[in-house]
Amino acid sequence: MLALDKVRYEYEHEWFEFDLNVADGDIVALMGPSGAGKSTLLSLVAGFIEPVSGSIKVNDQSVLGLAPYQRPFSMLFQEHNLFAHLTVRENIGLGLHPGLKLNAEQKQQVVDAAQQVGIADYLDRLPEQLSGGQRQRVALARCFVQPNPIWLLDEPFSALDPLLREEMLALVKQLASERQRTVVMVTHHLSDARAIASQIAFLSQGKVKVVSDCQAVTAQHPHPELAQFVAAALNEPK
């Protein structure tokens, strides 16, 4: 389980305080208005920034003070996931060894991962030779070859067209289920959350205001801020 307890952080005189529990195997979508603290929460968990106080634990073990690479998380962002000078094969291989010193079994893992995400034909290409969707497939492959039990996704597919986004989300859901991974994903698309998540954590004004079963999140939700947010989201063009 990932557990955040009274995690406080200050940025430009604005305070954030997060409480959130994510059970093993769950997929939780972080949603809320701009500036609510979604990416801040993810950055605190990942270790890119440190809280003023509070605790962040994975299976009752604190991760505070650990560098990002020492924490049990794999991360996927909207962009800047790949090293431009490395091939697809090498970019995926980094998930197994930072120096790319792979044994025969690990080299086969890279090939298998590429096949699972549909990029086996591009293993020796550079990222600049790929489309945006193909680059995100490479990043996803590197994400899941790592042994880390929790994936942190920060709007990884928001720049893709709706059909491709839907395909990538289905792939994440499938791979997470097969590998029994926990997923925490920031998204501003309600449809994305409904496609992949078991729960939605709604953030507003620097706090997690409510955590709700994904299918119960409607414009009639009893929490007024969440209901208003959903109503606005449903009226937005897809």
Swiss-Prot record:
Question: Disulfide bond: is it a keyword of this entry?
Answer: no
Domain ABC transporter, which positions?
Answer: 2-230
For ATP, which residues are the binding ones?
Answer: G32, P33, S34, G35, A36, G37, K38, S39
Name the domain of life.
Bacteria
**Reaction catalysed by this enzyme:** thiamine(out) + ATP + H2O = thiamine(in) + ADP + phosphate + H(+)
For this protein, the record's Gene3D superfamilies field holds: P-loop containing nucleotide triphosphate hydrolases (3.40.50.300)
Entry's family note: Belongs to the ABC transporter superfamily. Thiamine importer (TC 3.A.1.19.1) family.
Assembly and partners?
The complex is composed of two ATP-binding proteins (ThiQ), two transmembrane proteins (ThiP) and a solute-binding protein (ThiB).
Q: What role does it play? A: Part of the ABC transporter complex ThiBPQ involved in thiamine import. Responsible for energy coupling to the transport system.
Its protein name is Thiamine import ATP-binding protein ThiQ
Organism from which the protein derives: Vibrio cholerae serotype O1 (strain ATCC 39315 / El Tor Inaba N16961)
